[in-house]
Amino acid sequence: MVGNKWVVNGQKVWTTSAHKAHWGLLLARTDMDDTKHRGLSYFIIDMNQPGVETQPLMQMNGHASFNQVFLTDAEVLPDFQVGELGDGWQVATTTLMHERRAADSLRSWGQASKGDGPIYDQERVETETTMQPYKWYPQRAGRVDLIMDRAKETGAIKDPAIRQEIAKLMTLHKSAEWTARRARAAQEQGKPQGPEGSLGKLAASNVARAAAKVHTLISGADAMLTGEDSPMDGTIAEILVSFPASSIAGGTDEIHKNIISERVLN
């Protein structure tokens, strides 16, 4: 602390939508004598203030959802501290559990399973010239109705192996929806945050991977094509180069497996 302000220096990578955010959540070390998660504090920081620089990371799908953020002598007033000084880890883990639960929301999976809404997520059209509208995200990518339509169109639905893969995807999809229902029920009953957030996040990753596999089996080499004349207007091609992000966003799959093993299996 310098005077009555915290002065922060550091770097954070894989920050989603940081280039669009007005405010950010900052977990910073405020006690250099403590180790690991002790001595960390939680702040809200103005993303447009001096000392805060965001650099979008271009992905192989042509989008830039993730960013790296550089903090150089960025100042934060104590009024923007959340929780107790040195207790930021507890606040951060609670925030992350809510984030994962929101990403795996019952509403999202319910809409996806019913096929509600357009194939494209029209509300996420990027305004920057270097970015294009998203044609996918895990819940939409796993929409079984779209996959079934494509399988019928190509005749692949006659292949029992294809039908088996679609059935596996339906099973994963339903498992994700039920996990979201359990999380919602626990929240409504006032129960503390459990492992449901991590389970739901892993379920979303599994659905995205399974959907990419099924789309490839159904469309074959045509799945690589883009443009208006390609399968599903290029949606399949975008799924193939986008689904790996689902294992990173919201915490990597490996981190969530560690959380589950430590809190449930230990």
Label each PLM-derived region with a short phrase.
Residues 48-75, 84-90:
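Flexible, small-/acidic-enriched active-site or ligand-binding loops
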Residues 5, 98, 102-266:
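Alpha-helical interface subdomain recognition
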Residues 4-5, 9-57, 67:
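A short core secondary-structure module
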Residues 13-19, 60-61, 245-250:
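Glycine-rich phosphate/pyrophosphate-binding beta-alpha loops
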Residues 14, 23-25, 42, 66-70, ...:
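Tryptophan-centric aromatic hotspots in well-structured domains and transmembrane helices
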Residues 74-102, 108-109, 115:
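Long, acidic (Asp/Glu-rich), low-complexity accessory segments flanking structured domains
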Residues 27-28, 45-50, 73-75, 96, ...:
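Short Ser/Thr-interspersed hydrophobic loop/turn segments at strand-loop and sheet-helix junctions
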